Amino acid sequence: MKKLTPIILSTLTFILGWHLFTLYSGIPNFILPSPLSVWARFLKAVNDGSLPYHTGITLLEIVLGLIVGVLFATVVGYILAKSRSLEKVLSPYLVASQAIPVIAIAPLLVIWLGDGILSKVVICALIVFFPVLVNTIVGVRAVPTALYDLMGSLHASRSQILWKVEVPASLPVFLGGLRIGATLSVIGAIVGELVSAEQGLGFLLQLGDFQYDTPMVFVAVFMLIALALMLYGIVRLLENRFLKWQNKP
């Protein structure tokens, strides 16, 4: 509870300052709504079912994109970590792919894959791929040589070395990449939805914009923040669960 106290206090201070600013600044509600207006719009969207539905669609896109991106990044990262020659061949292309903003190719992906959930999942996976890939390579290569020598002296099989040495030793770095990828996956889903979608939080953002329903825009933005924080928190829980040994004296 002590860890949450500063967060709660800072959040309440922000909301109070926001409310006072909208109350005395004279700015119209359609430009900057008050917290009470946003809360009322949130309750309305929850009651009519639109917010749970569209949030569920976006969350599904995020989770699927995260799974696909992490799986591909982990497999490719492990292969490149074990083969420096292959990394030298592929790394220029991988780096070049990161020089192209995903938002620039998102319209192409929507044209090729359609405006359904598939294009959003692919966009999510592309954004997640690189940070997890890099951390996988770094994590696997950070395994001490002495551990390989020890397992070799015990005549350990390749699978035993993988699961008993490489996975545990590289897990801290890998989870660090997953933390980044989890939050970036939210951006991926929204980029796809803003390009073309008839459902999801990105659709609600555009709908609120077109209808000058600014409180709805704020509701959608805060839901995206909540999703990002939730995913980040899940990864932190995984770190606490699997990396307990790091905190031991």
Regions of interest found by a model, annotated:
Residues 111, 140, 187-223, 245-249:
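Glycine-rich helix-loop "coupling/hinge" segments at transmembrane-helix boundaries
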Residues 95-131, 138-139:
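Generic hydrophobic transmembrane alpha-helix motif, especially the helices
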Residues 84, 172, 176, 218-249:
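C-terminal transmembrane helix and the adjacent membrane-cytosol boundary/short C-terminal tail
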Residues 140-146, 150-170, 210:
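Short helix-to-coil transition segments within interhelical loops
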